[in-house]
Amino acid sequence: MGECAKGSNPSIFLFKKGSSIMANKNYKFETLQLHVGQEAPDPATGARAVPIYQTTSYVFQDCAQAAARFGLAEGGNIYGRLTNSTQEVLENRVAALENGAAGLAVASGAAAITYAIEAVARSGDHIVSQNTIYGGTYNLLNTTLKAFGVDTTFVNIHDLDQVKKAVRPETKAIYLETLGNPNSDIPDIEALAQLAHKHQIPLIIDNTFGTPYLIRPIEHGADIEHGADIVVHSATKFIGGHGTSLGGVIVDGGTFDWEASGRFPQFTQPNPSYHGVSFTNAAGKAAFAAYIRAILLRDTGASISPFNAFLLLQGLETLSLRLERHVENTLRVVEFLSRHPQVERVNHPSLSGHPDHKLYEKYFPKGAASIFTFEIKGKEKEAQAFIDHLELFSLLANVADVKSLVIHPATTTHAQLSREAQLKAGIRPNTIRLSIGTEHIDDILADLEHGFAYAK
């Protein structure tokens, strides 16, 4: 276990996919969400639950092993900022559920999105993004990253000509959400993947609201041309599911050919800050995830805590069960709102009149969109009166909890946007965002009716 030989291409074992035990079986999603990453009990104690490895550092057997690990010649934990054994189970499990090559868990969904963009784009580069996205991501792209020299053009992703015209020579990625936040609009993943790959750039998709149980964006790329290359999650939402823990996950699909593109030297050329390693040579299909862990996470440190990783794993074990109930309740609420005399419009793709209804049927055969908006008749006053008199729904900024949630986007989650930008994102003064939980549907509907009584 000596140091990596000069000029060799070390095997970066820090970026492991799920184990061969699970890979060699054709297990279903519901089984994978319980077992990937920990197919056997803890070897030290026999514990069946994933242990919480609450430590910052790891003891090396000797100087030779320490040198080998720091030189990336040997796999294993080095320091808690980069890896942790609880974290590793979460990474492998989400990567397997998304059918990706590697996963990386970080401190929050915002960190996952930031790292995914920073990995491909440098000062002077450009991103094309869907315009109807989460307000925090919009602000990241429109303001924060712009200050570091990364420009973004926001487009109507349903207008392919507009997307094509937005792509420049310096464009490094197209960014989407499988279900737009907050209006649940749906991009045509296959068409946009083809467009991105035609320009030799990756398609990055936030699948927080879709979840791998309802849609796997990478799988639409079975022939490489028709799916996402990178998937990001705010694991805080449906993956955790209980509003207890912050976390984010990046999944490297392993489908994008960084070498053939010739536009991403950070992955293909020797990196002077890491022993001259080329990440495509060292990590192969997991080069993107490897680069983020070894460089961005190392240097900026948005690491997930072992305890949060454990809590997110607990949520992940029931993802399919919860999503079935979320979707069932949501469709009942959509039907209720669509018929309500105090509702001006319901923005949900399950409705036949919704502009994305055909895409909903194509990409979400199990249903989807538990987070959506509707417009109450009236203005901001009526919207806020409705919200303030709900009793079961909690008024807070989170979504995708087992508890039903509500918020007024124009004055909260999307308040940073100008009024013009809000309108382009589908946010109006009378827009209300709902996140439908898993309570009994009769109680949910009764609470909504109670709110309407105070909004007349």
Language model regions located:
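Conserved N-terminal alpha-helix of the aminotransferase class I/II PLP-enzyme fold
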Residues: 62-111, 136-143
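Short, Lys/Arg-enriched N-terminal segments with co-localized hydrophobic residues
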Residues: 6-21
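Glycine-centered tight turns that cap/initiate beta-strands
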Residues: 99, 170, 342-345, 392, ...
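Conserved PLP-enzyme active-site core in the AAT-like
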Residues: 23-24, 41, 102-339
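PLP-dependent enzyme catalytic core of the Aspartate aminotransferase-like
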Residues: 16, 101, 142, 169, ...
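Conserved small-domain helix->loop->beta segment predominantly found in fold-type I
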Residues: 300-303, 307-309, 318, 323-325, ...
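Short conserved active-site loop signatures built around small residues
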Residues: 23-53, 250
